[in-house]
């Protein structure tokens, strides 16, 4: 699943995300260039014994890159995730995930065959209790380490081509902060040089659908840590807004009264790092 989001923009470059399944962060996986973890339900890679998926060679786009990125072979995100892995789980039917252990969005049940509809509501339609629950869920995600994913703290070259993995733990909330940063950051050219004239997150043809997938995945991870399968992210319709209607201390936080770079100390989020 997290080997899906980043490349929707990048190959838009190729299906994946900037984060790595914990099960694939070992030197063994990197040296084999294979990310096909066992599914706990049957103990086979990608749940193959149960027909969930199989370990397959990744398919790379042959479309040329745009002129705004005049490099080849300098960025780990090119042809993602081929720099790190060339075999990943390809899931069947309504299964998804790095080991095909979960259901595609909109499906549930032991065989992922049951349709599940959820409704997203305007944040201004939520009751006080519902708003407080939403904020509590965000706070839980901020302080809950991700069980499934880690983030890279170095490039593939810095990892000695997989021989010395460089990963660290991260919270569920910060995983998505990092994912968004990873897909949009500058290209590192080596020798402290960077190419700044690129933003795969916001200057690529997948801008809208990638961000939608990004939010649905974030929503899914919060459902998992809270056990609330009915949780949905509320939306803010700002089409006619004359200001930031959600920038209040009851919602996403007002401005600090003396420092416009900070949140109001009365905000739920003012203590976040």
Curated annotation (Swiss-Prot):
The keyword Glycoprotein applies. The keyword Nucleus does not apply. Binds 2 copper ions per subunit. Pfam families: Tyrosinase (PF00264). GO terms for cellular component: melanosome membrane. Keywords: Copper, Glycoprotein, Melanin biosynthesis, Membrane, Metal-binding, Monooxygenase, Oxidoreductase, Signal, Transmembrane. Cu cation binds at residues 180, 202, 211. Disulfide bonds: none annotated. Transmembrane segments: none annotated. It is found in: Melanosome membrane. It catalyses: 2 L-dopa + O2 = 2 L-dopaquinone + 2 H2O; L-tyrosine + O2 = L-dopaquinone + H2O. One of its GO terms (molecular function) is tyrosinase activity. This is a copper-containing oxidase that functions in the formation of pigments such as melanins and other polyphenolic compounds. This is Tyrosinase. It comes from Pelodiscus sinensis.
